[in-house]
Amino acid sequence: MAWRKAPKRNYFLYSIAGFVVLYVGFIAFRALYTSAVFARHDRINIAFYGDEATILSFGLTDNVNYIVSLSHEQKIMIPGGYNQYPMGSLGKLVEIEKDPDILQRTFSSMISAYVNYYVSPKKAEVFQKPDTDQPAYQKVDLIRRLFSSSNLTNMNVIDKFYIGFLIAKRRQQDYVVLRSSIRRDEEDGAHIFSEKSFLKKYKGFFYYQTLREEGMETQIKYNNYKSAVTLSRVIEGQGIRVADLSASDRNVSRCIIRTRAPRTSKTVDFIARSFSCDIETGETEGVDIIVYLGEEIESQWE
């Protein structure tokens, strides 16, 4: 029997199919690599914004869990040059700016620790619900919000199933309630969330024990001091020691981490993942890590 060549059309279809398989595999690998499952965090913090504003904090190594109770009636400081803004109108700001990561930066700044994920309605509205002594832990509703197409979130599908599992296995009594720290505005008497007071009251609550034990000293080099102060609070809130804030001698557009060791440490890995920093090896002037804040991150955290 004579051998027949496969039609060129078949080669084309096989090529397309192969490309699709590779692309799907790449997307799946990236989702797994960036997920909380792969990163193996000591603690995961999630902000739920909506009719009630709460932050859930899951202790994955110590099994100590927190629920941070927040009020829509208070004003909050929003990084990015927005200054004070009513909590209940935060969703409107996100919609106007078309930048949902404002939620992540805002809640991270509030608790002086890195908030990994956020969940918020896509359709913005103004919320007015006050703080409560015992915030409700409605696990079915929380899990539903994770998968609802009417909500926006920075979780991938693997994260959603993992976080849903964490929520499902915990009860109301498994959480320690952390209360808002409020100060009064001297001019109009408005309630303002005090980041300073909250940090003083709950310092160390959100530490990653692995980062604390690694004990790497970090220096932050900046061109914008206000951004450096905010970021240093968030980084220290993870258990990383910030030894110094200094004016930068480099102009960079993207955050850069300089480390002496060619092997990436857990501290370097955390900062790089959390703030999208590049990594380089070089002299670090007596500390373990130097973080050069670039224009991009400074404008976001100002």
Predicted regions and their residues:
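Non-catalytic, solvent-exposed segments at the cell envelope interface
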Residues: 2-302
